[in-house]
Amino acid sequence: MQTVLTSLLRSEFLRSGLALAKGAWKKGITLALVALLATSCSGVFLAETESNPWEVIALPTEAAISDVAFASDGEHGWLVGSRTTLLESTDAGKTWDPRILELGEQNYTFTSIDFSGDEGWLVGQPNIMLHTTDGGTSWSNIPLDPQLPGQPLLVTATGKNSAEMATDIGAIYTTKDGGQKWKGLVQSAVGVVRNMSRNEEGRYVAVSSRGNFYSTWLPGQEAWQPHNRENSKRLQNMGFTKEGLLWLIARGGQMQFGTEQTEYEEWSEPINPEFAASWGLLDVAYRTPEELWVTGGSGNLLMSTDGGETWMKDKAVEDVPTNFYRIKFLGQDRGYILGQRGYLLRYEEAHSNLV
């Protein structure tokens, strides 16, 4: 009897010990998972910027805004977009009013505007180019060849009576006489592009319509140079850093930075600034050589002060009900983020503690 009782007690003791050990094991696993989650989240959810330098402005239109530019005084500015939208500001972009031009019954999508002093150029689709020499008080229509390869996508004011215009298939033209005559700079087009960027040195980069490849063009080259994308992810957008290197955004919010500016085919390792927002990164702009801002869908706005090594998030604008699909700095103290449904963000340096 004692032997049986001893055996029962021993079995119960073992079961209790196993239960305690199992409970301790589960607790240990739980604590480990909590620690892992906390560590992981530090790389998923970014720290907030110390201040919000962006003022939200409601525009008197729900048209899609494509571009922004200012005349020489920095007070007289213009926004252009779909539905023949032309908005004018005379107070450095704080308020905007519609400007109606007599362009007939055709509805245009204005795609690009740029100024050199008070001389400005505006292009759009279907083929249209407007020119001003008085800051936009008056605009004249510059006739374009009906056989123009593609439709105007990008225009850059390059000096007195001078401009460069690029079409949506990569044809590039220049004028030195106010638009009366145009000279082609490339012998062949690159194909339909989803976006195109030009830096101050006159270099271009364009992403193919499906994001399968990108092309570059340098002044003096007879044709665009095609480049395969770095990996399997399709390209979303590309542009230039302050140093003339390339940056790219791929689908899924992946970013890379170019490491040389000769062949434009060497890249840093891919990064995802914030996994939680990685699905919607759309554009990049540099305020300084080291400070860059990245815009995205659903009010996502990220910022780095060290060239993309570390990142912060401007959470003050994440509830703005729009996609931030373009960002543009016109100087260190002037910047704009173009949204949808009539939303515009204006950079106010006075509101910023960022260096």
Regions found by a protein language model. Give the residues of each.
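Bacterial N-terminal signal peptides that target proteins for export
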Residues: 4-29
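Bacterial N-terminal signal peptides
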Residues: 28-39
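Residue-level hotspots at or immediately adjacent to binding/recognition sites across diverse folds
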Residues: 39-355
